[in-house]
Amino acid sequence: MDYKNLVAERIKENTELEVDLIEKLIEIPPKKEMGDYAFPCFQLAKTFRKAPNLIAEELKEKINKEGFEKVVTVGPYLNFFVDKTILIKDVLEKVLSEKEKYGSSKVGEGKNVVVEYSSPNIAKPFHIGHLFTTAIGNALYKILSFEGYNCIGINHLGDWGTQFGKLISAYRRWVDEEALEKDAIGELLRIYVKFHEEAEKDPELEKEARLNFKRLEEGSEEETELWNRFKDLSLKEFNKVYDMLGIKFDSLAGESFYSDKMDAVVQEIDDKGLLVDSNGAKVVMLDEYNMPPCMIKKSDGATIYATRDLAAAIYRKKTYDFHKCIYVVGTPQALHFKQVFTTLKLMGHDWADDCKHVGFGLVKLANKKLSTRNGDVVFLEDLLNQSVEETLKIINEKNPNLKNKEDVAKKLGIGAVVFTYLKNNRERDIVFDWKEILSFDGETGPYVEYSYARGKSILRKAGELTGEADYSKLSSKEEFELAKLLGGFNDAIMNAIDKLEPAMVTRYIIEVAKAFNKFYNAHGILNAEDNDVKLARVKLVEATCQVIKNALNLLGIDVVEEM
């Protein structure tokens, strides 16, 4: 039973408000002893022409209380206490019947959502900052898909621009082919850095690089062959990380894909009378929106990111007819996306309102114990490998005889890192601290994983239990609070979709793990006072494990069955 919906239906019977609006107004009381749901009666003051306190009292007398233990007033609020026995039975039966589908819905059926995320630059390090966009985008993709949306995951590769002219010059002069085969990104980065050092002494190198890129734009066979090699080598390295994270994309259409589509966009902007000359550059003026101009073409005629993003948005709308187009890109790019979306609106594309920028913070290291390949950039692959190694050390200390401990360390280590990136509001910076990330105490991935493994251990020991569970035996505060939390899984998911914030699911699952451990510590399960209580509690454990597994899967994290 959806109690929030039931509260809304009961209020609707006695007011003129619609259920959808009532559900949005319903709150969770700040203290558990105040009830399970609260409805603020302020919204009804105009209609009823009474003070909210009096309206609450009046509704309390009229409302159908079936399914609730009691309904009380707290000032202007109408507070509902659910019938604990009915709630526990409803929630556990629903979880155990729907299993891996529990928490899902068809709310997004028939709606396409484009999610652009990860988007590393070709020939540049796939560093620890990239995991923010990668983890958030992957989680949003999974969460939206779980609720019925048809998602298109796009890795908008940074595979075009004048930097490739520089890289071609650097490759021809200084590449070490042996080093390139061993560590492609490291070698490409080395020669790219060397190009900039040498260009300071010899400005002719910059001219040569521009000529190289011009040839690439014109389709020169030699330059195109080198560009493809850089791309193939980079993707081979990137795919190692994506394989570790279990991530696949529906499209790898990066910046180069739109190189032949930008002239049409520039022409469309010009045809609308929006293109203005500014010191030789072509811009769209956005003064009335309190924004600087959106540059479309530089003074040398080259297009820039904004032009490519405009072309990409128009192409995606034509190709996917999206309900939403989500850009998971760092918060510093907020102004850029405001300019792009506003320019789209000025071009007459009202669907620009369906384009959403999902920003995120920075990643900082608590100490310098993380090794780097070139002294300043921390490669993501190295970070994930180090997390697995550190986790294996912990397992060897705590449970050296654990079966498949390398596999467990891999799942736990990688999952711990992803969990850290998704734990807090995405716009907050992350301070990376191994001690905290890999701790089995506190609000961490390993803590949640350990809670799941503890539950699975109980289920293995319980074996096959026969008979129908009598959920009225679950009468304690800890049992009710846990079951009630399990019933709120879909609410957490819908909040994550509404705010485009995976942390809503992460925070939820931390609360579930805490509630489960409180229940575990307060009550005997396998040694319960009788078989009826034992069966009911085992079913509660089974439902908890199912919800934790479903939630972690939405975050892109594998569960560990034993540790």
UniProtKB/Swiss-Prot annotation:
One GO cellular component term, please give it.
cytoplasm
Q: What SUPFAM superfamilies does the record tag this protein with?
A: Anticodon-binding domain of a subclass of class I aminoacyl-tRNA synthetases (SSF47323), Arginyl-tRNA synthetase (ArgRS), N-terminal 'additional' domain (SSF55190), Nucleotidylyl transferase (SSF52374)
Q: Where is the motif 'HIGH' region annotated in this sequence?
A: 120-130
Q: Which residues form the signal peptide?
A: none
Check the record and name the Pfam families matching this protein: Arg_tRNA_synt_N (PF03485), DALR_1 (PF05746), tRNA-synt_1d (PF00750)
Matching InterPro entries: aa-tRNA-synth_I_CS, Arg-tRNA-ligase, Arg-tRNA-synth_N, Arg-tRNA-synth_N_sf, ArgRS_core, DALR_anticod-bd, Rossmann-like_a/b/a_fold, tRNAsynth_Ia_anticodon-bd
The GO molecular function terms of this record are: arginine-tRNA ligase activity; ATP binding
Keyword line:
Aminoacyl-tRNA synthetase, ATP-binding, Cytoplasm, Ligase, Nucleotide-binding, Protein biosynthesis
Q: Which reaction does it catalyse?
A: tRNA(Arg) + L-arginine + ATP = L-arginyl-tRNA(Arg) + AMP + diphosphate
Q: Which GO terms describe its biological process?
A: arginyl-tRNA aminoacylation
- ATP-binding found in the keyword field: yes
Documented EC number(s):
6.1.1.19
Family matches, as NCBIfam families: argS (TIGR00456)
Quaternary assembly: Monomer.
By sequence similarity, the record places it as follows:
Belongs to the class-I aminoacyl-tRNA synthetase family.
Name used for this protein in its record: Arginine--tRNA ligase
